[in-house]
C-alpha cells in the first residue's frame, strides 16, 4: 500500500498527523500535509484508511497494491469510521 496527499487540496487541519504521526507530517511554514513513508507497513493499513476517511477535504489517496491486479486507487469507498477505528485499534494492538 502507498498513500499520497493532494497538497493543493489539503486544508491543513492536521487530522492525518494526529491519527498517524509517523506516516504523515505537516510541513513548515504552511502546514500542508506530507507523507513520511514510501510504502505503508501492513500493520498500519487500517490506520491509514482511517486517516483517509477522516480527512475533512478528502486530500488523502490510498493506493492498494494487489499482486494479481496491479495498483488501484481506493479513495472510495472508504470504510465507515467505526469500522476503520476497529481495524486501526486491532493493528495498533498487534504492534505492541
UniProtKB/Swiss-Prot annotation:
Provide the organism lineage as a comma list. Answer: Bacteria, Pseudomonadati, Pseudomonadota, Alphaproteobacteria, Hyphomicrobiales
* PANTHER family hit by this protein: FERREDOXIN
The family database entries (Pfam families) matched by this protein are listed as: Fer4_15 (PF13459)
Function text = Electron transport protein for the cytochrome systems.
Per its Swiss-Prot or TrEMBL entry, what cofactor is needed?
[3Fe-4S] cluster
- What keyword terms does UniProt attach to this protein? 3Fe-4S, Electron transport, Iron, Iron-sulfur, Metal-binding, Transport
Q: Name one GO molecular function term.
A: iron ion binding
Q: What detail does the entry give on cofactor binding?
A: Binds 1 [3Fe-4S] cluster.
Highest taxon above the source species = Bacteria
Identify the InterPro entries for this entry: 3Fe4S_ferredoxin, Fe-S_cluster_ET
Please list the residues that bind [3Fe-4S] cluster: 10, 16, 55
Q: Which organism is it from?
A: Bradyrhizobium diazoefficiens (strain JCM 10833 / BCRC 13528 / IAM 13628 / NBRC 14792 / USDA 110)
What protein does this entry describe?
A: Uncharacterized P450-system 3Fe-4S ferredoxin blr2145.1
Q: Hey, what's the signal peptide range on this chain? A: none
Q: Where is the composition biased (Basic and acidic residues)?
A: 83-96
Where are the residues of the annotated region Disordered? 67-96
